Amino acid sequence: MKINKKNLIWIDLEMTGLNPKVHRIIEIATLITDTNLNIIAEGPVIPIYQKKEHILVMDEWNKRIHENNGLIKRVEKSLYNEQKAEHETILFLKKWVPIQVSPMCGNSIAQDRRFLFQYMPHLENYFHYRYIDVSTIKELAYRWNPSILDKFKKNHYHKALEDIRESVVELNFYKKNFLKFKKK
């Protein structure tokens, strides 16, 4: 284990919906990659306890997905609130990356950042202000080379750790098949 300012922090949140003023975080996971997108550490996967009233505001899609994958049951039994989950996550990150150095990495992570700003401001502050958003590259591929999208199929787990692992794989796919950087 070595702190490296070039390591990348990947994050995924599962939420009860998309509006941070109404909805809440129900799961968080992080992992660390090196600059070549090799996973070097996986952080804690933490279901976050939420009161029943916060669970009840979920729309039908979220209820179905999170009941089917067992997340709602894990949330109901969790001993972690947002602050404790934030603290545990930061303790993990401090082992691998200095504060405010790594961009926030993942899929549609601007959405995650909105929730971090609302409910986990210390964690939000841990990241650099930049992003590496795999969704942006996917949108560019859709517009500039749509046939490439047929070659990568997502599993849509809607579980935080599985989703960020898949985001790393997806970015590797785009790196090799769409961005095609020349080796030095």
Swiss-Prot record:
It is found in: Cytoplasm. Residues 8-171 form the Exonuclease domain. Its main location: cytoplasm. Keywords: Cytoplasm, Exonuclease, Hydrolase, Nuclease. Its EC number is 3.1.15.-. One of its GO terms (cellular component) is cytoplasm. InterPro entries: Exonuclease_RNaseT/DNA_pol3 (IPR013520), Oligoribonuclease (IPR022894), RNaseH-like_sf (IPR012337), RNaseH_sf (IPR036397). It comes from the Bacteria. The active site is at Y129. It is an enzyme of class 3 (hydrolase). Transmembrane segments: none annotated. SMART domains: EXOIII (SM00479). NCBIfam families: PRK05359.1. PANTHER family: OLIGORIBONUCLEASE, MITOCHONDRIAL. Belongs to the oligoribonuclease family. This is Oligoribonuclease. The gene is orn.
